[in-house]
Each structure stands twice: as C-alpha cells, then as structure tokens.
Amino acid sequence: MDFPREFDVIVVGGGHAGTEAALAAARAGAQTLLLTHNIETLGQMSCNPSIGGIGKGHLVKEVDALGGAMAIATDEAGIQFRILNSSKGPAVRATRAQADRVLYRNAIRARLENQPNLWLFQQAVDDLMVQGDQVVGAVTQIGLRFRARTVVLTAGTFLNGLIHVGLQNYSGGRAGDPPANSLGQRLKELQLPQGRLKTGTPPRIDGRSINYSVLEEQPGDLDPVPVFSFLGKASMHPRQLPCWITHTNARTHEIIRGGLDRSPMYSGVIEGVGPRYCPSIEDKIHRFADKASHQVFLEPEGLNTHEIYPNGVSTSLPFDVQYELIHSLPGLENAHILRPGYAIEYDYFDPRALKSTLETKAISGLFFAGQINGTTGYEEAAAQGLLAGANAALQAQGKEPWVPRRDEAYLGVLVDDLVTRGVTEPYRMFTSRAEYRLSLREDNADLRLTEIGRRLGLVDDVRWDAFSRKRDAVAQEVERLKSTWVNPRVLPAHAAEALLGKAIEREYSLSDLLKRPNVSYEALMQARTDEGELLAGPGVLEDDVLAEQVETQVKYAGYIARQQDEVQKHLSHEQQPIPADIDYDAVTSLSFEVRQKLKTHRPETIGQAARVSGVTPAAISLLLIHLKRLHYGSRKQAA
C-alpha cells in the first residue's frame, strides 16, 4: 500500500549519518521520515565506544556549530574526556571522549523523538522508487510505499554485508543485524559505480576478568574537564572512568602469525580494502614486522556494564586464535571474551559520482551519506549526514543548496576530497588533509559556521543567542586590544620585565604585546601599573572560552594571513614539472602513504600530483620544497 502521508525527505538508516541527516532536514523545516530496520538501535555505536580525535573532533565541533546532535549527546554520555595534542598549537588540538553506549543511544533517540517535523518508522527498506532520473520514494520489506521529494541513503555497512570470523562467513549488516541485500541489489540495477570495502572490530572482554594491577591507568583530563558542544557544560557529564593500557608481545605476535593461514584477509576470502589508519592486529603484525610491541587501550563500554573494548586488536582471525592472543596480553591472562571480533565487507559507491551537495549525479533527489561513500568513522558519517539532510531539505523546498568550501570547514575538505579524488580505501579525516587548518580549529567552528547554519534554518534560538554573545564579546575584546596603547610611562620597568622579559622602549598596542610568544592573555590582563591598577584587565579573563579565543585570534593573525597567501601561490605551481626520475623515498618529510601513491601514479606535474587521491595540499607544499632543493642543488653542481 501507499503510506497516506507524503514527505519532503526520507532518510534510510538510523546510524550516525542517518540520525544527523534526519535531524538536519527536520530543523530546516522539511517534513522528514526516518526509516530504520530497528528503532532500538538508533544512534548505535557499532564499533568503538568513543567520539572525536585528531581531525574527527574538528568534524564533531562543526556538526555542533550547525545545530547537530553528536557533540551534545557525547557531553551527556561521555565517561572520559581528553584533549589530544594539548601541548601543540590550537590548530591540531582535538577533543576525544569515551562514551557510554546506552547513554549515547538514549540521548540521540530523545532528540529524534522530540524533533518537530520528524517521523520515525521501523521497517527495512528493500527498494527505491525511481521515475526516469528522479527518486520519488522508498519501499519497505512488507511492500509499504513511502513517497518523498528527496531520499537520503545512509546504509552504513549493511549493503550486501558479509561478516567474517576466520574462514567462516555469514550475511549481516553488523553482529546481530541482518544485511540490506535487496536494497544492495536494487542499487546495482541503477548502475551506480560501486566497490567493496572492509572494516573490523575487536573481541569484547568482561572487565571483571582483567587484572588491572599490572596495567597502566589512563585517566581523563580534569583541569579543566573538556566539553564537546559549544552549549555543553562539564556538569552534564556522567560519572567519569579511566581507561587502561596493555601491550602485545612476542608471544602475541607468534600466535597471530601462526593463524594467518586461516585469516580471511590473508587467504583471499576478503576482497574489500580495510581502513589504513585503523588496521586489524594481524595487519599490524604483518606490515610492521620489526615492531616488538603494540599498545592496546582497554576502554569501558559504559557505567552499567562490565564490558571492555580492547582498542588496537581488531581482528577477523578464527576464534581459537582470538582466544589465545587475548590471553597472551598482560593483565588479560584470565580474561573472558564476551563477543568475538569480526570483519565485515560491504558495498560502497564511488563518491566521484556525487555532486558536492552529496546528491547523486545520475538520480535527481537521491543523496548518499556515510560509509556508503567510502568513509570510515562515526564523525565523518555524522558530518556527511548533516550536509546531505540539509541539502535534501533545501532541494525539496526549492532553495539553493549549501556546499562548504575547503577554507570554511573540515566538512568542506571531506566532501571535496570524496567527490574529486574518490577513495581506494576507507577515508578517515586528519588535520593534515586541510591546507587551511590554522583557520579550521575546533575552538572557532561556531564562528565559522553557526551564522551559515542559522541562514539554512539549522540553528535554533538558544544556540543563536549563545553564539551571538560569544561572537560579539570576542570581536569587542580583540578590537579593544588593537586600539589600546601602552607606553613606557604607563608600564613600569619591573612590570615589563615580568611580562615581557625586558622593558619597553616605545609605545605598543595591547595586541602587539600579546603577539609575543612569551606573553599570555592571562598575564597581560593581570599586569599592573606602579599605582597597582590593572594595566589592561580584566578583559574577558573570567570566561575561559572567550579568553582562549581572543588569545588565539590575536597570536595567529599573521600566520593565518600568510597561509592564505601561500594557498594562492599553489595556483602558480599547477604546471610545474616533476622530474621523471624523482626518488620519492628521498622525500622523507612525506608520509609513507603519500610516497606510496606518488610512486604508483608517477604524476608529471604538481597539478597532477595534487589530484592524486590521498595526496594532501600539505604534502604538495613539502614536495615543492624538495623540488626547490633539487633545483638549487643542480644549479650549484653546474656552477
């Protein structure tokens, strides 16, 4: 039968891409239907119980700045928070959180159920309704037809999913869930370019059987406790838990090597390519044969379960091998395995067949988001889902789409990489993929994107009011620092010595003083005159977020301006030739991945090199430096 209501947007799938897509479309004012095979698994964390990390945390902040749910749900469910790269510059600092799976799923479901314009319905989708080159709806497994102006497909690993444990395999979308084989077959009939990829997950451990006394404890950050959402507070967090660290050893590696003949990866059973940056433990042992040990992080799955996720031992080896390798790890000699690890192969579609809006070029109104586009990770999926959902809603309403630029957002980098370069392996976001990363920081995601989100209808009044106050306060303080001047008569020698390391000899703006590497905003605001009065404070010192933003904007202003100039210079290098006999292994500043790809493709020019999948703009800069050195060296020899 035909369902009696028609929709603007149908979202197929309730994972991280699907939930953000449905919420975004509904926030944008579209009448939205989310179809899922199981309402109980909406927002399910299918693999690791964590959100964020290098590059990934940036995407989560951007989703949040655009009104998405992932960050605030993590604040409500996070049981450990850390800032990675905290000793490095703000461009590469990233938030990461361990999340209670149940609390996270509940937080996402609550937002879905309370979102105006959004309907949920539990049925697996077996078919798409296509008229000519236009999608017009979806058909469920009981033949129920739902009609809509646009459809967002977020099928994850379910399209013709095949689960492997050793040489045994069976159909599944993930452990305990059926695959979407009928939908996968229908998409093949539409002749969209596709391939197979693979991902995996480790066995799960009963924490009561672990000997923690021999393990290294890894606590979260406590001063201050990080938050993910720009609307988040540390008081939202549930009780915090530590993680623990153990290591593989020679015995572990011997066990794994002994089981490789029964590994589906190494026996040719698995054809799909796995994620380079989240390899299985057997892949690590094979690729890094000279490495004596690998870290394994024991991560709690939640507050009300003893289940532990051993991050670092993803595997599809036979269970008897999994059993031995787990028991070879220090602290896990008597560990009880609750669930076996496994690998899963699934269909994906070449993202080069997508527009930058994430709409398919071949079928109008059909959008793809998440792992179906060849990406890996909750965060990458959520970001794509938000963009696809927003653009599906805009199209259904006859409005112009939004395509984020590379200089606006990591989301822009992600989409541009996908639709222009495609993928040969599951794509993971890193800060190194962004040439504008000094501008694309976690801390300014709202300043970059919330105004855009408001214009698109994605940002509600509460977020907009909080953002407006922050934006205005930062702008006012930065302007005050630029326009307030200090001379030697006002800043006494002893105060200057304490603040700057030496007395000042002429007049400086507060902004100029703050740009000095040894001067912090806090110290500048606390500096006093001979009369004991504050020289420039208190400013916005009482608000850590505002103070950090002001200091970062002032200190990095020059670097960001120079970076913009550098990007323009790349255009002039488009036709610069690369020597045919260049030894890429000699360019040691390039990552192994980039050197490998350049050796395979052998591009003739810098422009061609820049378009090789996986070769980042940052890598092109390093290659240009190497070519300049080669040119300079050959000129010296000729002289």
Curated annotation (Swiss-Prot):
The keyword tRNA processing applies. NAD(+) binds at residues 274-288. The keyword Cell cycle does not apply. Keywords: Cytoplasm, FAD, Flavoprotein, NAD, tRNA processing. Its cofactor is FAD. It is found in: Cytoplasm. Its main location: cytoplasm. Transmembrane segments: none annotated. It holds the Pfam family SAM_GIDA_C. SMART domains: GIDA_assoc_3. Homodimer. Heterotetramer of two MnmE and two MnmG subunits. NAD-binding protein involved in the addition of a carboxymethylaminomethyl (cmnm) group at the wobble position (U34) of certain tRNAs, forming tRNA-cmnm(5)s(2)U34. This is tRNA uridine 5-carboxymethylaminomethyl modification enzyme MnmG.
